[in-house]
Amino acid sequence: MWGACLLLLGLSLQVCPSVIPVEEENPAFWNRKAAEALDAAKKLKPIQTSAKNLVILMGDGMGVSTVTATRILKGQQQGHLGPETQLAMDRFPHMALSKTYNTDKQIPDSAGTGTAFLCGVKTNMKVIGLSAAARFNQCNTTWGNEVVSVMHRAKKAGKSVGVVTTTSVQHASPAGTYAHTVNRGWYSDAQMPASALQDGCKDISTQLISNMDIDVILGGGRKFMFPKGTPDQEYPTDTKQAGTRLDGRNLVQEWLAKHQGARYVWNRSELIQASLNRSVTHLMGLFEPNDMKYEIHRDPAQDPSLAEMTEVAVRMLSRNPKGFYLFVEGGRIDHGHHETVAYRALTEAVMFDSAVDKADKLTSEQDTMILVTADHSHVFSFGGYTQRGASIFGLAPFKAEDGKSFTSILYGNGPGYKLHNGARADVTEEESSNPTYQQQAAVPLSSETHSGEDVAIFARGPQAHLVHGVQEQNYIAHVMAFAACLEPYTDCGLASPAGQSSAVSPGYMSTLLCLLAGKMLMLMAAAEP
């Protein structure tokens, strides 16, 4: 029992000895680990060539506390104690902190932050792809204030480009790669005021297919691409999932007509088939009417995981000998936090790290720069002096001043603020372990808010050593542009990667065989009576 192995006196804590691995009781264990890390650090040398390929993976709302909690959860899922586990992003040798504020807000949103790290310019809250001279919801402040994304510059340089997300592809973060809008909510013309349409502003879905030639588009957001009332392919009887467009345009058909080798898919099976067909040069996969399902609710036979979408994108984009730019978003980490349902947020973050692992293993650090970061953090914390190895979703080992139990994970505000008979609920282990449990919050809000602390940047590959110290968030875009010698750094003076080989690493064939095996199993299952 906790009373037998936990002594809480002020800030002192004694952990039950049975929890501590025996080898960790010996100072030599820690000295050896530190010496190994020191040796690796001394051997670390910057890769001073240019980057043929650029990959940025962004965990929406993945603040440092979320990264740490994800590390613990991943370890516990693997049967370990948790904190000692290494995430894929932890393997990257270079890192920095990013200051996330918007030009007008101390606590930022995904539109302003996305514009910063994707375009290289900070801007106002709720504004995408425009400078801070633009004003939210004022259409006439759009023109002349556009800023250009690194992805757009990569395309101009002849590289292939792609966008992958677990949200809708019109969401503020992916939209930062291609759109210019004074309102992040203008997914289709149905969300826009008549005055904005009359003034010539375009909805984000229209900009997705018209602003630039994107080779791979994978995520959710189907209903914003089709005329109002068009039945959804997956949910034909659910009118809430039907098309929303008032202009009668079928943007998917318009996009297909632009490219001879274009393919549109809406489920995992079609995605795998299309990705293996080398005649497919452009791929759009929209797997849900709006955001994709949480990982814990995903039907693996119907919808691809973020890791699978990342693999498909890398494989297709790698066909271009001039290289590629890829943006990957683990977007529903943010949504889980807004709901104060930590189980959803952290399981999404574990899947996001799997996508990082895919990108890392499918590419070479000699020619591919990979950056992993977040747009902002959340008022998410975990504490309470829990025992090492205790569930990240579990209770603190002592009672609060009101005599009731509390979870290690708590939120500063949000819908988790609930009173029962005028008092805080006494939560149980069974309740806190439920995947739908809302952690308690200090202040009642319908949706938990972002927070303002710095977020981490992890980097590997050519010029990754430039990711260092504490930087403004827009620095990220400039590092990536410089590494690939893109505008405005075309005279970067960097040598090309040795050999200019394909980005896909030797381990790629094994993952391809796994995809093929999965497809065969699906076909066999479908053939059974």
Swiss-Prot record:
Lipid anchor positions (GPI-anchor amidated serine): S502
Which residues of this UniProt protein bind Mg(2+)? D60, S173, E329
Keywords (alphabetical) are:
Calcium, Cell membrane, Disulfide bond, Glycoprotein, GPI-anchor, Hydrolase, Lipoprotein, Magnesium, Membrane, Metal-binding, Signal, Zinc
Give the positions annotated as glycosylation sites.
N140, N267, N277
Q: Which residues form the propeptide?
A: 503-529
Q: Which CDD domains does the annotation name? A: ALP
Q: Which residues form the signal peptide?
A: 1-18
Residues the record lists as binding Zn(2+) 2: D334, H338, H450
Kindly provide the name given to this protein in its UniProt entry: Alkaline phosphatase, germ cell type
Its cofactor is: Mg(2+); Zn(2+); Ca(2+)
Q: Where in the cell is it found?
A: Cell membrane
Q: Where is the active site?
A: S110 (phosphoserine intermediate)
User: Which residues are involved in binding Ca(2+)?
Assistant: E234, F287, E288, D303
Sequence similarity: Belongs to the alkaline phosphatase family.
Q: Phenotype when inactivated?
A: No visible phenotype. Mice reproduce normally, give birth to live offspring and do not display any obvious phenotypic abnormalities.
